[in-house]
C-alpha cells in the first residue's frame, strides 16, 4: 500500500521553560507537547487485503501527554472495537468509505496545554475496469492522422499514467515523433498512419497510488492503402491555462497531426524560456522544473511542416502555498508585561492568519496581549492558510513571577575602564516583574549627573573616566517579590592611542602598497590590530594572496597589500584594540588601472543596417579613457564581435556613435568596452535586445536545380537562405519556370522560408522536357535578385511495360526465388516485387526493390507451408508500372524442430566416431533427407561441412585446441535445429558435450543435443 501525501507543512518550535508560578524541581523541567510525527494524507485502496489503516501521531512532552483523535471535528470513540491506539497512532480495522473517509486531527495534551496536529485526509482509492464492450474497427487512410480514445474508467485519485498495448500484453508501442500518448487524457495520437501501424491497440492505465492497472478492449486499427497525401500541421493535443505551485514541476503537452510529421517548437511570449525548462518526447512535452514566479506567462507551441503551420497558446499562472516569513517561538514573559507575537506568512493568494490556544480557536490576525496574567500561559498555535495549503507554528507561553536574583548573572568582580574613556557596568538580575534599580559607590548613593547615568535596564554609564572613579560599585534591584544586590570593583587603565597613523597611498594595478599603523596601550593588556576596507573587516586567511600583517612587533600593525587590484581601492581603517578600549585611524588607497565598464547604454535610432548608441562614462580608475570599442552579438550566435562604427575610432571623450553594416531584420545586443593607457577594462552590461528594420533581400538562393518526381510533375529545388539573409518578415520564395526556349515565365510563391522544394503538377506536361528555372527571395519590404537560371527536366512517365516470364521457385520453408525478363523501356530505374500471404489482404503486401540491372531476387523470412501471391512491376521516379500476372506458390513445410540426439562420441586412433539417433519429423514438418555435419575450430563460424544420409560420421582428432562438431537434420524445408559437442586432441579425455548427459556404458559417453 502506498500513501498519497499532500504537502501539509507543520513547523513546531517548542523550547521548554518552567513556569515560575509553579516552582517545584519537577515542574521546572516540564514542557508542553512538541510534535515529532503528524498524520499525513493517506489513500486506502478499496480492494486492499490489509484490513486496516493507520494514522500516525507522536509527540514528546513532560509529563507524558495524552492523545485523542477527531474525525471531521467530531471526537472519535476509541472504546469501539474498530479503533485501537498504540501510543498516539490510530489504527482503524476494516475501514469503510462511508464511515471512515474524512479529515483527521490528532489532539495532544498535558498539564502545560494542548496542541492540534495538521489535518490529514483519509480517502479511498479505486480504479474500475474498462467496459466489456468490443470496439469497432478504426479504418484510416495511409498518410492521414488518427486519434485512438482511451476514455479511462472511473477512478480516484487522478494520478493515472497511460501506455498503449499493441496486439498482446506486455508489448507496448514505442513512442516517437509520429506517435504520442497524452498523460492528460490517455489518448494515442498518430501524426500520420502508415501500413506498419496495423494492429490491435489497448489503453493500459495504471494508478501508482493503489498499485493497480487495467487495460481496455482492443481497438483494431486498419490502415487503408492509398497514395500518401500531404496535410498541414493540425494541433490536437492542446495544453490549457495551468495553475502551478511555486517550486513544483509543471508539464505541458502539445502534439499535432500532419503529413509529413510536423516539427514542434516551444516559446514563451516576449520572454526567454525558463532556465529549468526541458523539452522531451520529440518536442511534444515541455517540463518546467522548480517553477518560479518569473516563469509565469504565456507559452506557445508551434507545429509546422512544409504544408502549413498551427499555433496554440495558453497561460501558466504561478501561485504558492503558505510559507513562514516570521513565526512564533517558545516565550517566557514577566507577569504584567505585554506580549506581541509576530506571525507572518507569504503565499499566493496571501494567507490568512488565525490562532489556537490549547487547541481551541482563539483569535485572528496579529496577537497582542497587554498585562499578562497566569491565565494567559499555555500552548499557542499560529495557523497560516490559503487555497493551496495550511501550515502551523507551535509555541509555549510561560508567565514568570520571581524576586530579583543575581545567581545566574552576577556583576563582574573586576571592571576595567580606560583613562578618559567610557565604561558601562551591567546589572542584569533575573526578576519578574521588572525591578527598580539604584547604584552606590562605596557608601555613596549615585544619581544621574553630567558624567554618570543609570539606564532603564539597570546599567551604569561613566564617561571621561579618571583615577577618582576607581572603587567598589553596587547595583540594587527591587520588585514586589523581593530585593537583591551585586558588587564589583572598577579599575582604570591607560588609554590606547594610535601613534603612527596610515597615510594615503597611490598605486597602479599589480603593484604593492604598505600602510603603517603603530599604537601605544596599557602594558598590562594585550593589543590587537584590526584592518577594515570601506567598513568591512579584512579576513586575512581568505585574502592571504593580497593582504599580509606585520606580526613581529607587538605594537606595530603594518599592512602590506600585494599585487593590488582595482577592488582593493578604498578607505582603510586601522583599529588598535584591547579588551578595554580601542583607537582607529584611516587612510585612502587610490588604485590606477584599466577603466571600469561604461554604463547606461541607450539605443537612440534604429535603421535597417545601422543603429545609434549613447552611453555614460564609467570610472576611468585615475587614468583618462583613450578610446571605446563597441561589440555586437546576434541571437544566432553567442560570440561577441567588434562592430563597425562611425566614426571608426571612438575617442575617450565621446559618449555616442553609430554602428553600421548590420544585417536587416536581425536581433542584436550591444556592449561597450573602454580602454586607457593601463589597459582594456571590463565590458558594459549588454544593451536591450533590438531588431533592425527590414529591407528587401539582396542574396539569391543557391543550388537551384531539380527534376525527377512523379508523372506529370516538375520538381524544382534550391538551398533555402539562412535566417540572417531573410532581412524582413513574411519571408518566402518566388519560383519562376518556363519550357526551354519560350519567352513567358510562370511564377509561383512559396511562403515557408525553410522549404527548398516546389513541385508543379500539370496533366498536360510532356515527360522528360527541358525547363528553365530560377528562384528569388522576397519579404514584406520587397523582392531580392533572381538566382542564375538552371535547366532541368520534367518527370518522365511511369513505365508502361509489364515484366514477362515471371517464374518462382521454392527454396525452403522460408525462402522463394523470383526471376523475370527485363522490360525494354530505358526509363526504368528498378523493379518492385510484391508478395503477400493468401490469407492477408493485398494492401498488406510486402515489397522488395532491386536495381534495373537485376532480374532475380530471393524472398526471405516467409512463413512455412503458406500460400503466397507474387507479382513484379517496373518503376522509376515517376511511379510504378503495371504489375505482372500474379503467381501463387506454397512454401515448404518447416524443417524438423527436433535436434539430433548424439548418443556417443568415441576416439579411435586419429579419428572421432560420432553417432546420433535418427530425427523423425512431425506431421507439419518436412521429411528428413539427411544430415549436415559442420566441423569447425571452437570460437569460429566457418569449418568443413559434411553431408551424410547415415547416423554416424568420422572426423579427425584436432591437432591443437578444441573443435566443435555440429549436427543437424536436413530437409526440403531447410535445416533443422543443431546439436553440438566439443572434442579435443590435447588428451585422451572425453569430449565435452554442450548440452548432454553422461550415461554409464563401458567407457562410452552418451549425449543429447539441444
Curated annotation (Swiss-Prot):
Give the Fibronectin type-III domain ranges: 597-695, 700-797, 802-897, 899-990
Q: Where is this region: Disordered?
A: 679-708
Q: What does this protein do?
A: Mediates cell surface interactions during nervous system development. Interaction with TNR enhances the neurite outgrowth.
Q: Which interval of the chain is the signal sequence?
A: 1-19
Subunit composition?
Answer: Interacts with TNR.
Glycosylation site list: 200, 249, 329, 448, 464, 485, 512, 582, 924
The record's listing under InterPro entries reads: Contactin-1_2_Ig1, Contactin-1_Ig3, Contactin-1_Ig6, FN3_dom, FN3_sf, Ig-like_dom, Ig-like_dom_sf, Ig-like_fold
One GO term in the molecular function aspect is: cell-cell adhesion mediator activity
Q: Which SMART domains did the record assign?
A: FN3, IG, IGc2
**Keyword flag Membrane:** yes
* Record localization: Cell membrane
Q: What is the protein name stated in its UniProt record?
A: Contactin-1
GO biological process terms, alphabetically, are:
axon guidance; cell-cell adhesion
Write out the GPI-anchor amidated serine lipidation residues: 984
What Pfam families does the record point to?
A: fn3 (PF00041), I-set (PF07679), Ig_3 (PF13927)
Name the residue ranges with Polar residues bias: 679-689
Family in the record = Belongs to the immunoglobulin superfamily. Contactin family.
Q: Which organism is it from?
A: Gallus gallus (Chicken)
Amino acid at each position: 500500500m502506498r500513501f498519497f501525501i499532500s504537502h501539509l507543512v507543520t513547523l513546531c518550535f517548542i523550547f521548554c521553560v518552567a513556569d515560575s508560578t509553579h516552582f517545584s524541581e519537577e515542574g521546572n523541567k516540564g514542557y508542553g507537547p512538541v510534535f515529532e510525527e503528524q498524520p499525513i494524507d493517506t489513500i486506502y485502496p478499496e480492494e486492499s487485503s490489509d484490513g486496516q489503516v493507520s494514522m500516525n501521531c507522536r509527540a514528546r512532552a513532560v509529563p507524558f501527554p495524552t492523545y485523542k483523535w477527531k474525525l471531521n471535528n467530531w471526537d472519535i470513540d476509541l472504546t469501539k472495537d474498530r479503533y485501537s491506539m498504540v501510543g498516539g497512532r490510530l489504527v482503524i480495522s476494516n475501514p469503510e468509505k462511508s464511515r471512515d473517509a474524512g479529515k483527521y486531527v490528532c489532539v495532544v495534551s498535558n498539564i502545560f496545554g494542548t496542541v492540534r496536529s495538521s489535518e490529514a485526509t483519509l480517502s479511498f482509492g479505486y480504479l474500475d475496469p474498462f467496459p466489456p464492450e468490443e470496439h469497432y474497427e478504426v479504418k484510416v487512410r495511409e498518410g492521414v492522422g488518427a486519434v485512438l480514445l482511451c476514455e479511462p474508467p472511473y477512478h480516484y485519485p487522478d494520478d493515472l499514467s497511460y501506455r498503449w498495448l499493441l496486439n498482446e500484453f506486455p508489448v507496448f508501442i514505442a513512442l516517437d515523433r509520429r506517435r504520442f500518448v497524452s498523460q492528460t487524457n490517455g489518448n494515442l495520437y498518430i501524426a500520420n498512419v502508415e501500413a506498419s501501424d496495423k494492429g490491435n491497440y489497448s489503453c493500459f492505465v495504471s494508478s501508482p497510488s493503489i498499485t493497480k492497472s487495467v487495460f481496455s478492449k482492443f481497438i483494431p486499427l486498419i490502415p487503408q492503402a492509398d497514395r500518401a497525401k500531404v496535410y498541414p500541421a493540425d494541433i490536437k493535443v492542446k495544453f490549457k491555462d495551468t495553475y502551478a505551485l511555486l517550486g513544483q514541476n509543471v508539464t505541458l503537452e502539445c502534439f499535432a497531426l500532419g503529413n509529413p510529421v510536423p516539427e514542434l517548437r516551444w516559446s514563451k511570449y516576449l520572454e526567454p524560456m525558463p532556465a529549468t525548462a526541458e523539452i522531451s518526447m520529440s518536442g511534444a512535452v515541455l517540463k518546467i522544473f522548480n517553477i518560479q514566479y518569473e516563469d509565469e506567462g504565456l507559452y506557445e507551441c508551434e507545429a509546422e511542416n512544409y504544408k502549413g503551420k498551427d499555433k496554440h497558446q495558453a497561460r501558466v499562472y504561478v501561485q504558492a502555498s503558505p510559507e513562514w516569513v516570521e513565526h512564533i517561538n517558545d516565550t517566557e514573559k514577566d507577569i504584567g508585561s505585554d506580549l506581541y507575537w509576530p506571525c507572518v506568512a507569504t503565499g499566493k493568494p496571501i494567507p490568512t492568519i488565525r490562532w489556537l490556544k490549547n487547541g481551541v480557536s482563539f483569535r485572528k490576525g496579529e496577537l497582542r496581549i497587554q498585562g499578562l496574567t497566569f491565565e494567559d500561559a499555555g500552548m499557542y498555535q499560529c495557523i497560516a492558510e490559503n487555497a493551496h495549503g495550511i501550515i502551523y507554528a507551535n509555541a509555549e507561553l510561560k508567565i514568570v513571577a520571581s524576586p530579583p536574583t543575581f545567581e545566574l548573572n552576577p556583576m563582574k568582580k573586576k571592571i576595567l575602564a580606560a583613562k578618559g574613556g567610557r565604561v558601562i557596568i551591567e546589572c542584569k538580575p533575573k526578576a519578574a516583574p521588572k525591578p527598580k534599580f539604584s547604584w552606590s559607590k562605596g557608601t555613596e548613593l549615585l544619581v544621574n549627573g553630567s558624567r554618570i547615568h543609570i539606564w532603564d535596564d539597570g546599567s551604569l554609564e561613566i564617561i571621561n573616566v579618571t583615577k577618582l572613579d576607581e572603587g567598589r560599585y553596587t547595583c540594587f534591584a527591587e520588585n514586589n517579590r523581593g530585593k537583591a544586590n551585586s558588587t564589583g570593583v572598577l579599575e582604570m587603565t591607560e588609554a590606547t592611542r594610535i601613534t603612527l597613523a596610515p597615510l594615503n597611498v597611490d598605486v597602479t594595478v599589480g603593484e604593492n602598497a604598505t600602510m603603517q599603523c603603530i599604537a601605544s596601550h596599557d602594558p598590562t593588556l594585550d593589543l590587537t590590530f584590526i584592518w577594515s576596507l570601506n567598513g568591512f573587516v579584512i579576513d586575512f586567511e581568505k585574502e592571504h594572496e593580497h593582504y599580509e600583517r606585520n606580526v613581529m612587533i607587538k605594537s606595530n600593525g603594518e599592512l602590506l597589500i600585494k599585487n593590488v587590484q582595482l577592488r582593493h581601492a578604498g578607505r582603510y581603517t586601522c583599529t588598535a584594540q584591547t579588551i578595554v578600549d580601542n583607537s582607529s585611524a584611516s587612510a585612502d588607497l587610490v588604485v590606477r588601472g584599466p577603466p571600469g565598464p561604461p554604463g547606461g547604454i541607450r539605443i537612440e535610432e534604429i535603421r535597417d543596417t545601422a543603429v545609434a548608441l549613447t552611453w555614460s562614462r564609467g570610472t576611468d580608475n585615475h587614468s583618462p579613457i583613450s578610446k571605446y570599442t563597441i561589440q555586437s552579438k546576434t541571437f544566432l550566435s553567442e560570440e561577441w564581435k567588434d562592430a563597425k562604427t562611425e566614426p571608426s575610432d571612438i575617442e575617450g571623450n565621446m559618449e555616442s556613435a553609430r554602428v553600421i553594416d548590420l544585417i536587416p531584420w536581425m536581433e542584436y545586443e550591444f556592449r561597450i568596452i573602454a580602454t586607457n593607457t593601463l589597459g582594456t577594462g571590463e565590458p558594459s552590461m549588454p544593451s536591450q535586445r533590438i531588431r533592425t528594420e527590414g529591407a528587401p533581400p539582396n542574396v539569391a538562393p543557391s543550388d537551384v536545380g531539380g527534376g525527377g518526381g512523379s508523372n506529370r510533375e516538375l520538381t524544382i529545388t534550391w538551398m533555402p537562405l539562412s535566417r540572417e539573409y531573410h532581412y524582413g518578415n513574411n519571408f518566402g520564395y518566388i519560383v519562376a519556370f518556363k519550357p526551354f526556349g519560350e519567352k513567358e515565365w510562370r511564377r509561383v510563391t512559396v511562403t515557408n522560408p525553410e522549404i527548398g522544394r516546389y513541385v508543379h503538377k500539370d496533366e498536360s506536361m510532356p515527360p522528360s522536357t527541358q525547363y528553365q528555372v530560377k528562384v528569388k527571395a522576397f519579404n514584406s519590404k520587397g523582392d531580392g535578385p533572381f538566382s542564375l537560371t538552371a535547366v532541368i527536366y520534367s518527370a518522365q512517365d511511369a513505365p508502361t511495360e509489364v515484366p514477362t516470364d515471371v517464374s518462382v521457385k521454392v527454396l525452403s520453408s522460408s525462402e522463394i526465388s523470383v526471376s523475370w525478363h527485363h522490360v525494354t523501356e530505358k526509363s526504368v530505374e528498378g523493379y518492385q516485387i510484391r508478395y503477400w500471404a493468401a490469407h492477408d489482404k493485398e494492401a498488406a503486401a510486402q515489397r522488395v526493390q532491386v536495381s534495373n540491372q537485376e532480374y532475380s531476387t530471393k524472398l526471405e523470412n516467409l512463413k512455412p507451408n503458406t500460400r503466397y501471391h507474387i507479382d513484379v512491376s517496373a518503376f522509376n521516379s515517376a511511379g510504378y508500372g503495371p504489375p505482372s500476372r500474379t503467381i501463387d506458390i506454397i512454401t515448404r513445410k518447416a524443417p524438423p524442430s527436433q535436434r539430433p540426439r548424439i548418443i556417443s562420441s568415441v576416439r579411435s586412433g586419429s579419428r572421432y566416431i560420432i553417432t546420433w539417433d535418427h530425427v523423425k519429423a512431425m506431421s507439419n514438418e518436412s521429411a528428413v533427407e539427411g544430415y549436415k555435419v559442420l566441423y569447425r575450430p571452437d570460437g569460429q563460424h566457418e569449418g568443413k561441412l559434411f553431408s551424410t544420409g547415415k547416423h554416424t560420421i568420422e572426423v579427425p582428432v584436432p591437432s591443437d585446441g578444441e573443435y566443435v562438431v555440429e549436427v543437424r537434420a536436413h530437409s526440403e524445408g531447410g535445416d533443422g535445429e543443431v546439436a553440438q559437442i566439443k572434442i579435443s586432441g590435447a588428451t585422451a579425455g572425453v569430449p565435452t558435450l554442450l548440452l548432454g548427459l553422461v550415461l554409464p556404458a563401458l567407457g562410452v559417453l552418451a549425449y543429447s543435443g539441444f
